[in-house]
């Protein structure tokens, strides 16, 4: 398929927007960019479709806040959505990579902390 680019879905809060202040409202993105994520997205877009996924985008003001935040940092993406699209990979700060082994999965869930709270 000429021109086909596989989709990469990237979570907004905690992956792009550092989210160190926590939830302030759908239209509020007060925290800085996660260092280097702009360059990663730019690189991925050479051969992938990049879609930003966030429950924040369910509200019009949230979708606009994401759009404005990306524009502020000169980040171009292929879409913003509130639902997870079919993708080859999902980049999320609140995920456990399932390896097919369920032995310690419940324990991993109980002990999980996103990178923004690891020191707490």
Predicted regions: what is each one?
Residues 1-120:
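Catalytic phosphate/metal-binding cores of nucleic-acid and nucleotide-processing enzymes, i.e., regions
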